[in-house]
Amino acid sequence: MHHTRRMATLRRSLRLLRSFPYEQFRPRVFYSSLARDTRMLIDALANDLSLPPITNHSVLDVGGGPGYFAEAFADCFYVGLEPSVSELSAAGLSGFGSVRGDGAALPFADDSFDVVYSSNVAEHIPNWQTMGEEMLRVAKPGGLVVLSYTVWLGPFGGHETGLWQHYVGGEYARHRYAKVHGHEPKNRFGETLFAVSAREGLEWAEATGRLAAAFPRYHPAWAWWVTRVPVLREFAVSNLVLVLRG
């Protein structure tokens, strides 16, 4: 993972950390930065796994949201799948390049895409393992599959409900947010936010027999070792990247 480790610098980690507060009130700032970083990450992974450059290749974004990632993959045959009509319409996404569908039942044939990735979606659905299996199904043999998600016990597990409230409990964090702000959070525990551990992700990925790498997305490379330590990784790995081969 030479190229991927080279991009995982402390400067990058700090840049991403500074963008997190913008997610709720200036989403374009946050998601555009995350999209560019995702493209660099996938380029580096493809290089490390001796895959051809992804330019002009097919890319499926499972949970593409309001279209910010499409800009980062403009030189690819990009397809963004999003279940929410409101997310699609908010960005004016329609027709070519966008598909409404369920990540747990992808509306594509087997072996369809060179690259299949999902960024920060798994923690928002109750059946993320099914989504992961579907991602592997539609990836071409030997293709690249990247699934990254927010670990529940990491500092950002509670999303906008706060940095510590979810440690008391998901329901507590949800109700406290509603009491303070006068409305429910976008990410409602038990409905649109679920507790996914690092252990669950690693066990699922290893069971597929296709795991190529696993590391913390927002950490500099010298801190990747925390992924290998049970218990510690649940708190120290804020976002886990699972890299698999189709």
Say what each PLM segment does.
Residues 126-134, 140, 144-245:
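S-adenosyl-L-methionine-dependent methyltransferase catalytic module, highlighting the catalytic core
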Residues 100, 121-122, 149:
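Alpha-helical architecture
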Residues 115-126:
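A short SAM/SAH-binding and catalytic strip from SAM-dependent methyltransferases
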Residues 1-105, 117, 132, 194, ...:
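Conserved N-terminal segment of class I S-adenosyl-L-methionine
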Residues 65-69, 138, 159:
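Gly/Ser/Thr-rich beta-alpha loop segments that engage phosphate groups in nucleotides
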Residues 105, 123, 154:
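Active-site micro-motifs of SAM-dependent methyltransferase domains
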